[in-house]
């Protein structure tokens, strides 16, 4: 054993041979010799000395290891034997304030000394190791036997020494690891330290909201500019300049020993820059010309901790007083230290040793470059400089660019055909982390858009009700509406009484919303904004039983979205998109037909006779055939004399003319126009039905009925002459109760019909013809009255009823009609034989005929239905033949019907209300001849022209005169109470607003049909799969995780490290003995500011794939289903999700603990998939909002102007839209996401999610922006972080001398999750067409940051150049 040496038992220490003269390289030999001294002695004595010897051994090796690293330049090491008794050290430093001598006449500053307090931080490190009982037994026993015993003894020695070496190595690494963590705890990010340097003067003032906001903006700007620095660029000058700023931002230490850490050329080392080996390799390769290998004189030992008047330490507090503390104190106070001279000299003298280090020159500073790879290599401890950073990105899908953006900034790089250039964008293209193009469109979003929660307004309504009506005086007018149910009996006759009262009618909130154009809708001045909670439902307050109650109804169709959220030009562009996908073309020469139609229905000379014929025929084929010659003659006369297509005001007459006057009764050129009108109606009908439905059925209804309201039998046309064949689920009310079959009676034309004629004014029963309209006829009739007429008249038509009892008597109760000559022979077809002149002899004068038929009939018929071959009396007698088919007086019927099965999810009890005119007619001019018999019926927003009503009714005339602002055609003219049910109608205020101003062209007709596309999950599925814009946009939110390397700069000697020998304790067991090695380390900051700072220098890899996988809400909210089982299965199949088959126990477990029910793919080549969550967004949201960091909610949640600790004020700042937000000064950019209780708040706010039963295992990138508690917590943290850092921006002269320069609370979040703390998401490169993305890929690196517009398409550039350079910078 005497021949063994420790060099054979322990590896050599990797240090220079001339290093540390007093710490020998034979430390291992000394350890071995010490063990041999006690070999075989008393075990108790051995154990005691073993622990002491091992502690000294560890102390020497770990400090040798530490002092050889460049990190030691940031330390000032001191040995203090009584450190174990020190718990909290408080040190006072004398600082003399620098002064500047001033000129004559100016006051001079006095000499000032400041006492600065520093606290020590205790951070012990510890490591255990075990020795088996067998090893210790062999070591304790004396062997005098065979060689085998000696071998066993040697093996035991080897085992012990291996354990000791491993433990010593752990202590070596642990000291560096502990010191690095200490430096990081007092090293804020560069963007914080630099901002404090720039705003040091602010710290001397009382901080106001403007200054605090400026500080935050500086934080964000510098963070975005320096994040992933080394991935951004390979520009040497830029990197060198940044590293220089990084070093200059730090404060110098007060312990500047000029003899230590100097280069061979005499340059003083200013600090050390530490990072991972990868970052250092990049920097050294970039700045190789600025980095040199220098010999640096480093201290070879640590100093002793002594109390002397010369050093900066004046007091230390202990829990236990040292035995010799009083004597030290006596020496200090006497001023004559009697300490041994050798100890004082040893304390002041430092042994130096030359070390070879990489040194870089940064401005005036010389800095050591160091990486700690050797410390963490092959260990299970993560390098503190390796961290994860979570960044949240957002981008739009389907935004509409208004007409004023009809330009391009892409020059000639991209050429799109007209179809693509002008189409609404429904797709977003992005790049994933591998720079592969990714696409997301509305089809990909079906797993979110089709979930029952989106079509369920109950949570929104609950919040809306709990919040109550607004109490501000300016908003009281929003609460005045009453929706009263009145009996329909005599409703038409009661209309004048409504206007006779001359009382101003409160406007509904829906009407008020239409007053705000797109630019004003999102502003604070929009007082109706609080009701805009959900894109699929209308919310309002109204009066009921003298109480203000909340009302929520489905919007039913896309056209009911407010004009500010879906303006007319958007609907027109959407119609072009539908037409392109349908690939339908209008009939030939349709422009001329529509021109004639428009001229006719807007002509002030439209003949009144047409209205009388319409009422007499009322859609009856027999009646029409009886007077077909009369009708044909009217058409020919009016076309030749006035260029009018008469009878064009009535769908029934137009279709009868097109069908029954094709046998030569009408000239072909005229018949062509009527048939063209029907062809246009059929074209619009086809536009309103998506291609590929193939007469599909769902829940025993055609799929087309789920897509567009025109194909739903529950929607009725405003003017009705026949009942439809399909009346399933529809209730018709003529008086008080819905009609049943017993209350519907058939007309018997041609036989005695005295009872019916006697009941012409009766409300019940309802008399109908035997003929029932087919589904196709019903749809065409709706297209005519809901699309064609409003678009061509701009709502300048009106409903009209005639007093037939009086009118027919006054017209036809004359001898000319009662005593017809025998010579008259009229065929059943209505034609007169050539031998007869219908009793009119040649000698009869025109005057005699006029006298025979009367003045009123003459005015109606003459020049309209007469010609050279048909005198007035004959024409009048032809008209008289239709009297036998006369109907009853006009009635307004109320049609009540539920919605289709897909739309009943949210409000299953909702019953829609429509009011239709029965036995009336549509008029486009006010009758003058028939004025005494006319009754205006303004029952519908399309058919309530106040000009016509005022001309026919003195009460309405006086009403409009007194309230001139009601003289309008955009739906602002108030309807009688019985018809004013805005929130229960199928077509609401936005329809009449559009039709009042739309151009009189076919496209406007089709636009009204496109606005009738339904809002339902089934309709969304069919529209999106046909690549048709659904009427709203999406904001996609995605969080990506980046694995990054930090760069740390620390000034020289910025931290004092106080140490002593490790303490070794043992814990004996039966089979082993465990030794615990503990090293007490105390550190003291030696700066009067921040002496260290960090930055996120390099991204190693992106953990997520940066893809576009949409969050599956069917798995997030697994328990929600649609009420109709067949509809639920159809929607799930279309969206590509399965219906869960869960037992009760599984359900409870999922809702309580969460469950990852998503199946893993068979093979995943993209790594961890990022989840995109979708926020429904108005299409008019400003695209510029997505070009800078902003809150995906549409309203800023970062509120530095409000004390976040005042929860009420903080909540108000988040949700009160009467105050502008902090970022854009608008109330919001997305009311469906920014308000309390809105749709996205319900989806992503945990408070609401718990009510819906969500699966907590799914990560939600949106939750951080919607969870109120999390928002307020983030604001509290940010508020406190800024305040705390600004306190540390003060210098010790004017600031608090007790301030400790450490990272304050929130710094970790500011680095690792800045988006959550600042409540903003970052833009990312996205385009609306693949062509624009390909252009960006070809345009070089700089193209990725540029946002561009190309007519209706756009590019959103990235603000952090991820795709531009970071992920692909070689």
Curated annotation (Swiss-Prot):
Membrane spanning residue stretches: none
Keyword Protein transport (UniProt): no
Disulfide bridges in this chain: none
Keyword Acetylation: no
Entry's localization field: Virion; Host nucleus
Domain of life: Viruses
A Pfam family: Herpes_MCP
Gene Ontology cellular component annotations, sorted alphabetically: host cell nucleus; T=16 icosahedral viral capsid
Keywords: Capsid protein, Host nucleus, T=16 icosahedral capsid protein, Virion
An example Gene Ontology molecular-function term: structural molecule activity
InterPro entries, per database record: Herpes_MCP, Herpes_MCP_upper_sf
HAMAP family: HSV_MCP
Free-text function comment from the UniProt entry: Self-assembles to form an icosahedral capsid with a T=16 symmetry, about 200 nm in diameter, and consisting of 150 hexons and 12 pentons (total of 162 capsomers). Hexons form the edges and faces of the capsid and are each composed of six MCP molecules. In contrast, one penton is found at each of the 12 vertices. Eleven of the pentons are MCP pentamers, while the last vertex is occupied by the portal complex.
Subunit structure of this chain's protein: Homomultimer. Makes the hexons and eleven out of twelve pentons. Interacts with triplex proteins 1/TRX1 and 2/TRX2; adjacent capsomers are linked together in groups of three by triplexes, heterotrimeric complexes composed of one molecule of TRX1 and two molecules of TRX2. Interacts with scaffold protein; this interaction allows efficient MCP transport to the host nucleus. Interacts with capsid vertex component 2/CVC2. Interacts with the small capsomere-interacting protein/SCP.
UniProt similarity note: Belongs to the herpesviridae major capsid protein family.
Name the record gives this protein: Major capsid protein
């Amino acid at each position: 054993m005497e021949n063994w040496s420790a060099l054979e038992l322990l590896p050599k220490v990797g240090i220079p041979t001339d290093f540390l003269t007093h710490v020998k390289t034979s430390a291992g030999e000394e350890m071995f010799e010490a063990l041999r001294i006690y070999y075989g002695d008393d075990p108790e004595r051995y154990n005691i000395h073993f622990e002491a010897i091992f502690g000294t051994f560890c102390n020497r090796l770990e400090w040798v290891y530490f002092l050889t690293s460049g990190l030691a330049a940031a330390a000032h090491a001191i040995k203090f034997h009584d450190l174990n008794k020190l718990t909290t050290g408080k040190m006072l430093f004398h600082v003399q304030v620098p002064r500047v001598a001033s000129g004559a006449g100016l006051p001079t500053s006095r000499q000032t000394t400041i006492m600065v307090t520093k606290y020590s931080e205790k951070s012990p490190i510890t490591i255990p190791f075990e020795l088996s009982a067998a090893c210790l037994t062999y070591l304790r026993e004396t062997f005098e036997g065979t060689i085998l015993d000696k071998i066993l003894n040697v093996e035991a020695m080897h085992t012990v020494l291996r354990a000791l070496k491993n433990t010593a190595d752990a202590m070596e690494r642990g000291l560096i690891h502990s010191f690095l963590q200490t430096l990081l705890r007092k090293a804020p990010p560069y963007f914080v330290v630099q901002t404090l340097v720039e705003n040091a003067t602010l710290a001397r003032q009382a901080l106001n909201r403007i200054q605090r906001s400026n500080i935050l903006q500086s934080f964000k700007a510098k963070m975005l500019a320096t994040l992933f620095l080394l991935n951004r660029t390979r520009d040497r000058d830029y990197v060198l300049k940044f590293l220089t700023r990084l070093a200059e931002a730090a404060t110098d230490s007060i312990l500047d020993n000029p003899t230590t850490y100097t280069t061979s050329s005499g340059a003083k080392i200013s600090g050390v820059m530490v990072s991972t080996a990868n970052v250092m390799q990049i920097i050294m390769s970039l700045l190789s010309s600025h980095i040199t290998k220098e010999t640096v004189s480093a201290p070879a030992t640590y100093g002793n901790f002594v109390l002397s008047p010369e050093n900066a330490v004046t007091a230390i507090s202990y829990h236990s007083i040292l035995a010799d503390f009083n004597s030290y104190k006596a020496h200090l106070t006497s001023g004559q230290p009697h300490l041994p001279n050798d100890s004082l000299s040893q304390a002041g003298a430092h042994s130096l040793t030359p070390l070879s280090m990489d040194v870089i020159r940064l401005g005036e500073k010389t800095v050591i470059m160091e990486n700690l790879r050797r410390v963490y290599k092959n260990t299970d401890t993560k390098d503190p400089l390796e961290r994860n950073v979570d960044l949240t990105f957002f981008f739009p899908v389907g935004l509409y660019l208004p007409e004023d953006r009809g330009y391009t900034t892409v020059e000639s790089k991209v050429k799109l055909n007209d179809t693509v250039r002008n189409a609404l964008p429904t797709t977003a293209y992005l790049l994933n982390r591998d720079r592969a193009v990714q696409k997301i469109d509305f089809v990909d979003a079906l797993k979110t858009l089709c979930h029952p929660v989106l079509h369920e307004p109950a949570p929104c309504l609950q919040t809306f009700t709990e919040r109550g009506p607004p109490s501000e005086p300016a908003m009281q007018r929003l609460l005045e509406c009453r929706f009263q149910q009145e009996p329909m009996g005599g409703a038409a006759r009661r209309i004048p009484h409504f206007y006779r009262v001359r009382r101003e009618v409160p406007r509904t909130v829906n009407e008020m919303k239409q007053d705000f154009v797109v630019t004003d809708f999102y502003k604070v001045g929009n007082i109706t904004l609080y009701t805009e909670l959900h894109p699929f439902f209308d919310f309002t307050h109204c009066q009921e039983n003298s109480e203000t109650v909340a009302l929520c109804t489905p919007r039913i169709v896309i056209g009911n979205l407010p004009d500010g959220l879906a303006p007319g030009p958007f609907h027109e562009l959407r119609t072009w998109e539908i037409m392109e996908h349908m690939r339908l073309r209008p009939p030939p020469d349709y422009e001329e037909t529509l021109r004639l139609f428009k001229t006719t229905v807007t002509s002030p000379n439209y003949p009144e006779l047409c209205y009388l014929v319409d009422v007499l025929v009322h859609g009856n084929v027999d009646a029409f055939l009886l007077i077909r010659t009369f009708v044909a003659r009217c058409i020919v006369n009016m076309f030749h004399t006035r260029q009018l297509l008469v009878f064009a005001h009535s769908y029934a007459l137009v279709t009868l003319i097109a069908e029954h006057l094709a046998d030569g009764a009408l000239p072909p050129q005229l018949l062509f126009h009527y048939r063209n009108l029907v062809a246009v109606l059929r074209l619009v009908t086809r536009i309103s039905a998506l291609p590929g439905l193939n007469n599909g059925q769902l829940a025993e209804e055609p799929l087309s009925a789920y897509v567009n309201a025109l194909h739903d039998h529950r929607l009725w046309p405003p003017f009705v002459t026949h009942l439809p064949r399909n009346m399933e689920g529809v209730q018709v009310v003529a008086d008080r109760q819905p009609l049943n079959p017993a209350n519907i009676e058939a007309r018997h034309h041609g036989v005695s019909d005295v009872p019916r004629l006697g009941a012409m004014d009766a409300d019940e029963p309802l008399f109908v013809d035997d003929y029932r309209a087919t589904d196709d006829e019903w749809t065409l009739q709706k297209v005519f009255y809901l699309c064609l007429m409003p678009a061509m008249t701009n709502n300048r038509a009106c409903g009209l009823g005639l007093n037939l009892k009086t009118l027919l008597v006054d017209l036809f109760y004359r001898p000319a009609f009662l005593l017809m000559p025998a010579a008259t022979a009229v065929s059943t077809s209505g034609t007169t034989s050539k031998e007869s002149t219908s009793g009119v002899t040649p000698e009869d004068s025109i005057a005699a005929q006029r006298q025979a038929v009367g003045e009123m009939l003459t005015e109606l018929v003459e020049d309209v239905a007469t010609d050279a071959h048909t005198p007035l009396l004959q024409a009048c007698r032809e008209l008289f033949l239709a009297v036998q088919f006369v109907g009853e007086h006009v009635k307004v019927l109320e049609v009540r019907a539920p919605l289709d099965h897909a739309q009943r999810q949210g409000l299953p009890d909702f019953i829609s209300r429509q009011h239709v005119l029965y036995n009336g007619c549509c008029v486009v001019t006010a009758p003058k001849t028939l004025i005494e018999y006319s009754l205006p019926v303004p029952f519908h927003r399309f058919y309530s022209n106040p000009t016509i009503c005022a001309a026919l009714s003195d009460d309405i005339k006086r009403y409009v005169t007194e309230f001139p602002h009601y003289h309008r055609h955009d739906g602002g003219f108030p309807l009688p109470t019985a018809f004013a049910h805005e929130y229960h109608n199928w077509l609401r205020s936005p329809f009449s607003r559009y039709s009042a101003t739309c151009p009189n062209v076919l496209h406007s007709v089709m636009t009204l049909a496109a606005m009738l596309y339904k809002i339902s999950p089934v309709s969304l599925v069919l529209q999106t799969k046909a690549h048709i814009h659904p009427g709203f946009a999406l904001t996609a939110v995605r969080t990506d995780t980046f694995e990054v390397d930090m760069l740390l700069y620390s000034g020289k000697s910025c931290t004092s490290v106080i140490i002593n020998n490790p303490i070794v304790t043992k814990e004996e067991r039966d089979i082993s003995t465990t030794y615990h090695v503990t090293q007490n380390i105390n550190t003291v900051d030696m700066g009067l500011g921040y002496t260290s700072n960090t930055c996120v220098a390099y991204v190693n890899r992106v953990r997520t794939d940066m893809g576009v996988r949409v969050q599956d809400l069917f798995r997030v909210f697994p328990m929600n289903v649609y009420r109709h089982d067949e509809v639920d299965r159809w929607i799930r199949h279309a969206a590509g999700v399965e219906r869960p088959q869960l037992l009760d126990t599984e359900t409870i477990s999922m809702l309580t603990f969460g469950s990852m029910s998503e199946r893993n793919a068979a093979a995943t080549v993209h790594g961890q998939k990022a989840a995109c969550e979708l926020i429904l967004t108005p299409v008019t949201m400003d695209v510029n909002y997505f070009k800078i960091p902003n809150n995906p909610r549409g309203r800023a949640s970062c509120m530095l102007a409000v004390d976040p600790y005042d929860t009420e004020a903080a909540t108000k700042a988040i949700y009160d839209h009467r105050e502008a937000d902090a970022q854009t000064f608008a109330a919001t950019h997305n009311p469906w996401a920014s308000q309390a209780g809105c749709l996205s708040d319900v989806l992503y706010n945990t408070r609401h999610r718990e009510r819906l039963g969500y699966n907590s295992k799914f990560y939600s990138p949106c939750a951080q922006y919607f969870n109120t508690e999390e928002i307020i917590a983030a604001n509290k943290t940010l508020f406190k972080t800024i305040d705390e850092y600004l306190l540390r921006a003060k210098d010790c002269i004017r600031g608090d001398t007790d301030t400790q320069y450490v990272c304050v609370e929130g710094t970790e979040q500011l680095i690792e999750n800045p988006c959550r703390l600042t409540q903003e998401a970052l833009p990312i490169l996205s385009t609306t067409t693949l062509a624009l993305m390909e252009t960006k890929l070809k345009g070089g690196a700089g193209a990725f940051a540029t946002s561009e517009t190309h007519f209706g398409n756009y590019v959103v550039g990235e603000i952090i150049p991820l795709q531009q350079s970071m992920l692909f910078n070689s």
